[in-house]
Amino acid sequence: MPCGKPGDYKYGEHTADVLIQAYGCTLEEAFKNAALALADLTYYSSRVEPKESREVAVEYEDLEGLLFRWIDELLYLFDAEKFALSRRIEVKLEKGNGYAIRALLYGEKYDINKHGFTGLIVKAMTYHMMEIKKVEDYWLVQYVVDI
């Protein structure tokens, strides 16, 4: 179902950091687009084929902590395994005593010749300027990463 979201995500300027605003008609879609925005900072996720998969499960007591752990886990997969995300990501968000994300990520080993390099390397996730909120009929997920 279409909604009035302004796009999938956009970047904002921030010295030595990058502000990311990801959008979704659902919170799950916003978290998925937050992951794609992270990937597209370093390489072109549209060039990544969904050859391999990784299961990711993260939990936290609030949505901000959940977002931090989600992005941090994706950074780990790229740094430790050179796992490049394709645009195929299945995200399920659960709410109980806290929040949990169960995701199935598809991608392949990063290859600079195939996936490209934007010139930016994300070093770390931060809590700076983090915001998660519903705006009219869509969700906004905002966060800052160190580059």
From Swiss-Prot:
GO MF entries: calcium ion binding
Pfam family of the protein (one): Archease
Domain of life: Archaea
GO biological process: tRNA splicing, via endonucleolytic cleavage and ligation
Gene3D superfamilies documented for this protein: Archease domain
Keyword Zinc: no
Residues in coiled coil: none
SUPFAM superfamilies per UniProt: MTH1598-like
Matching InterPro entries: Archease, Archease_arc, Archease_dom, Archease_dom_sf
Keywords: Calcium, Metal-binding, tRNA processing
NCBIfam families per the UniProt record, alphabetical: PRK00407.1 (NF001617)
Name the UniProt record assigns to this protein: Protein archease
Species in which this protein is naturally found: Pyrobaculum aerophilum (strain ATCC 51768 / DSM 7523 / JCM 9630 / CIP 104966 / NBRC 100827 / IM2)
